[in-house]
Regions:
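A cross-family "folded-core" feature that marks the main globular domain of proteins
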Residues: 1-283
Length: 283
């Protein structure tokens, strides 16, 4: 296996013997003074077909979190009845790192979709619960059980849909509303969002969950009043933007967004804008 790009000391982008691009992980495989050829014994894990947008996560996420997420992705592939995308380990790692950050910041958020996920996707929810239990053991933090729904959603959203399948009317509407919501964020937060970036893909995935929840029959959850109040006061522009995005969603789909959902949406908007915010723009 030949190295074509060293990502960090323990990760490299390679070409295998069949000419396919692959990400190789292993202790020291990306060391600058190392060899350009890797032996199988040097490699602990490989990933084929991963979108290049996800590669920066290898430098941003704790290797222990990434390894845990990779194991969870392996378990999911063996248990669900549908094909999962090549990026799953990376999207799970990003989501789990965000959970850990929120727990460490004492920001416990009720997942707005938890009830629906638990009953509509029992296997994925079970995987989420097992992941929460293991995270408590591995990372020594009190992860709330409600986070199981978010992990389940990360698995569900990774489902591979045949490219030959024509877009339904609802899918086209989702695309239109997603574009509208993105333009609202760009205008109100005064940023330019790269629609080819991983950060945008993460934001778009969250909006898709909201579209499904609002257009369905499930009632929104309430709670987290203290956190909602804190977000309004500390990030007034972000929360106001979330409210406008929420109005765009409910105008298109009906229903309403609970304050819990606005809070979670605010966190995603803030996260999306962190790296691209214009100089001098406060949130």
């Amino acid at each position: 296996m030949r190295i074509v790009q060293r990502i960090n000391h323990n990760a490299a982008l390679c070409i295998d013997g069949d000419g396919r691009e692959v990400i190789a992980l292993g202790k020291g495989v990306g060391y600058p003074q190392g060899t350009d050829e890797l032996a199988p014994a040097q490699i602990s894990r490989t990933f084929y077909g991963v979108d290049a947008r996800y590669l920066p996560l290898l430098n941003e996420i704790d290797p222990a979190v990434f390894e845990f997420s990779s194991q969870l992705a392996d378990a999911a592939r063996g248990l669900v009845s549908y094909e999962l995308g090549a990026n799953l380990a990376f999207t799970l790692a990003d989501h789990i790192a965000f959970i850990i950050q929120r727990v460490q910041d004492n920001m416990a958020i009720r997942m707005p979709f938890a009830h629906d996920i638990r009953y509509s996707y029992p296997m994925e929810y079970k995987l989420g619960k097992l992941a929460i239990e293991r995270m408590r053991e591995l990372f020594g933090i009190p992860v709330p059980e409600s986070e199981a729904a978010g992990i389940a959603m990360s698995i569900i959203s990774s489902q591979v849909v045949p490219s030959s399948k024509a877009k339904s009317v609802s899918a086209r509407r989702n695309d239109r509303v997603l574009d509208q919501c993105t333009r609202i964020v760009e205008q109100e937060m005064r940023v330019r969002i790269d629609r080819e970036s991983f950060d945008f893909a993460r934001f778009a995935t969250h909006l898709q969950y909201l579209f499904e929840r609002v257009s369905g029959d499930a009632a929104p959850l309430e709670g987290n009043e203290a956190l909602v109040k804190s977000m309004r006061e500390e990030y007034p522009r972000v929360f106001a933007c979330a409210e406008d995005v929420g109005r765009a969603i409910t105008t298109s789909y009906g229903g309403e967004l609970a304050e819990d959902e606005l809070l979670y949406l605010s966190l995603h908007i803030n996260r999306l804008c962190e790296k691209v915010e214009a100089p001098g723009g406060g949130r």
